[in-house]
From Swiss-Prot:
Major location (coarse): virion
HAMAP family: INFV_NRAM
Protein name per the record: Neuraminidase
Alphabetized UniProt keyword annotations: Calcium, Disulfide bond, Glycoprotein, Glycosidase, Host cell membrane, Host membrane, Hydrolase, Membrane, Metal-binding, Signal-anchor, Transmembrane, Transmembrane helix, Virion
Lineage, uppermost ranks: Viruses, Riboviria, Orthornavirae, Negarnaviricota, Polyploviricotina
This protein's encoding gene: NA
């Protein structure tokens, strides 16, 4: 083949390839335009529900990127069904509790910037669990941490992180408050935060990141709320709030909240004499709370909330092995279901329990007089039989040589049942540990299990001599 023939052959092949490429580009563009105009809209009926639909090819904000050569096609994914939580599944059957999470905040504070906190709790949205606490407006290794034993200052804010993530400097402060409660209704978070002067405080109701409602003090004596999660059923969230004496008659109200708006307020009724710091859980179709009687009883009050008609009843846990601190020893303690036992009732600590048929699961400090150690157990007949004392399935969570503090319940919905979990506040610093000037905490978290489990102790674990003063 002479040079001219080679040139002609190469040119012909190049022209053919170019033509093929050109035609392919035209085909791709035609396909892309066709796909962009091929739409099958989702049906969106009333009640804010989204029905299942076929995938649609259309440019929208919610997109999944699919690459085809050099062309980008944006494919919409139909939104998932978003519903209010109703908590209608049965309670899980458990044999005890297994370790779930520990944040080690105090140990980490020895060498890092970690918030000073107290009054922690845990709550979950439908997909993830979060830990909350009331911050003191300072990190531990900071002179502002001096004298943080005080409960109520204007600098306190509600902190929120994923469970297991200590409250570092990047932690979100969701509202201002020295008392709080939070819960997720299936669509968004509700936060209730109380702040202001003791005699004229304000509770702010923040829903989906926006301030929706508020209420002022009704008894001018330290308006306060649960210090653990509230509960939402079919879009109605219940929050127990108290205003009045911490060691005498107080005025407790149950607030019903829908998307952050107060829709009803019910006064406490029933036989409970004093109710504070309730640990609440869904008991479909209502809500049940186990609280703190800081006046007359070391047996814990029970508050039953009817979400449909706003009615309230109250009583006391029947178990003769009582849950508050201080308390009588187990041989001499009593509870007869309806009234406070008048045994070391003045003072107390936030705690929890939950019913299991006629029985009751509960947690409490191991010490009868101080916030030291922590144990859980089941009392046979403890929900229905006055002064029942048969204890089974006891577990030590924190040994008696180490400090504990507040504790509370939270609920987690599984595929077939609702599990009960609890957290324990592990307080460190003042008043007991006077080498330092701060007061703060870490937490440990356990959840119900139907399996087997071992033994151990999970204290805070920080060496106070290694901590900043």
């Amino acid at each position: 083949m002479n040079p001219n023939q080679k040139i002609i052959t190469i040119g012909s092949v190049s022209l053919t390839i170019a033509t093929i490429c050109f035609l392919m580009q035209i085909a791709i563009q035609v396909t892309t335009v066709t796909l962009h105009f091929k739409q099958y809209e989702c049906d969106s009926p009333a009640n804010n529900q989204v029905m299942p639909c076929e995938p649609i090819i259309i440019e929208r904000n919610i997109t999944e990127i699919v690459y085809l050569t050099n062309t980008t096609i944006e494919k919409e994914i139909c939104p998932k069904l978003v519903e209010y939580r109703n908590w209608s599944k049965p309670q899980c059957k458990i044999t005890g509790f297994a370790p779930f999470s520990k944040d080690n905040s105090i140990r980490l504070s020895a060498g890092g910037d970690i918030w000073v906190t107290r009054e922690p709790y845990v709550s979950c949205d439908p997909g993830k669990c979060y830990q909350f606490a009331l911050g003191q407006g300072t990190t531990l290794d900071n002179k502002h941490s001096n004298d943080t034993i005080h409960d109520r200052t204007p600098h306190r804010t509600l902190l929120m992180n994923e469970l297991g993530v200590p409250f570092h400097l990047g932690t979100r402060q969701v509202c201002i408050g020295w008392s709080s409660s939070s819960c997720h209704d299936g669509k968004a978070w509700l936060h209730v935060c109380v702040t202001g002067y003791d005699k004229n405080a304000t509770a702010s109701f923040i829903y989906d990141g926006r301030l929706v409602d508020s209420i002022g003090s009704w008894s001018q004596n330290i308006l306060r709320t649960q210090e653990s999660e509230c509960v939402c059923i079919n879009g109605t969230c219940t929050v127990v709030m108290t205003d009045g004496s911490a060691s005498g008659r107080a005025d407790t109200k149950i607030l019903f909240i829908e998307e952050g708006k107060i829709v009803h307020i019910s006064p406490l009724s029933g036989s409970a004499q004093h109710v504070e710091e309730c640990s609440c859980y869904p008991r479909y179709p209502g809500v049940r709370c186990i609280c703190r009687d800081n006046w007359k009883g070391s047996n814990r009050p029970v508050v039953d909330i009817n979400v449909k008609d706003y009615s309230i009843d109250s009583s006391y846990v029947c178990s003769g092995l009582v849950g508050d601190t201080p308390r009588n020893n187990d041989r001499s303690s009593n509870s007869y279901c309806r009234n406070p036992n008048n045994e070391k009732g003045n003072h107390g600590v936030k705690g929890w329990a939950f019913d299991d048929g006629n029985d009751v699961w509960m947690g409490r400090t191991i010490s009868e007089d101080s916030r030291s150690g922590y144990e859980t157990f089941k009392v046979i007949g403890g929900w229905s039989t006055p002064n029942s004392k048969l204890q089974i399935n006891r577990q030590v969570i924190v040994d008696s040589d180490n400090r504990s503090g507040y504790s509370g319940i939270f609920s987690v919905e599984g595929k077939s049942c609702i599990n009960r979990c609890f957290y324990v506040e592990l307080i460190r610093g003042r008043e007991q540990e006077t080498r330092v000037w701060w007061t703060s905490n870490s937490i440990v978290v356990f959840c119900g299990t139907s399996g087997t489990y071992g033994t151990g102790s999970w204290p805070d674990g920080a060496d106070i001599n290694l901590m900043p003063i």
